[in-house]
Amino acid sequence: MIWSDESTIILGRKSRRRLCIRKKGHAFKARHCDGTVKSGKISIMVWACFSGEKVGPLIVCDTGNVNADRYLEILEDGVVSFINKILQPCEGSDTVEVAADDAFLFMHDNAPCHTARKVTQFLKRKRIPVMKWPAQSPDLNPIENLWTMFKDAFHKRLIEEGIKPSSRAEVLKHCKTILKEVWRDQGMELITKLIKSMPRRCAAVIAAGGGYTKY
């Protein structure tokens, strides 16, 4: 199973709130405070994937939003190359050939760029089987939990290195390498734990009648 998703990283704020305790008189010292972005939020979209065997690539979307054409590039650069590292491609073929229909499944949600006709045709041509995915179900995708931890680690790395980009161009110039390094640091132990939570996730969604769950 290959899990994938896009996510937006917003600079100038953490991905989630945290409760912290400061010593008396230290609460408002500059080194204990997170700054805000004065010129408006800076956002970067990234795409990534993983399987139960490997952490896949992380791709930074320079153009901002992802449309069908950009997603085709992501599939070619990210998914096809990742699958070829996991499975042995058929000799003499530049497509992913699968010996059995159930050798693997590729998961992406129902975003318009994922379901566009040209994308569907590309996946069929490459013989990449796609998992049917229920609408509005981020709680069933374990990569969503990984995104939260990844964003926290990325923000921490920026603070540690004293990097404070003031524009999107600066983020793309200075942070691409850091983004990819932080993603690679997400260990297989954590990913395996998230994947093993799938039976509980499915049971929770069924028990909730398709409604909200803790995931």
Predicted regions and their residues:
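C-terminal anion-handling pockets and recognition modules
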Residues: M1, T8, I143-Y215
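Extended, low-complexity cationic-aromatic segments
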Residues: M1-V80, G209
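Acidic/histidine-rich, metal-coordinating catalytic segments
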Residues: S4-E6, P89-H114, L140-N141
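Generic structural signal for small/hydrophobic residues in well-ordered secondary structure
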Residues: D5, A48-F50, L75, D109, ...
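Acidic, Ser/Thr-rich intrinsically disordered and amphipathic helical segments
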Residues: M45, F50, R70, I74, ...
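A long, amphipathic alpha-helix that forms part
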Residues: N65-D102
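RNase H-like polynucleotidyl transferase catalytic core
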Residues: F106-N110, K124-N145, E161-I163
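Short, aromatic/basic amphipathic alpha-helical patches
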Residues: A116-K126
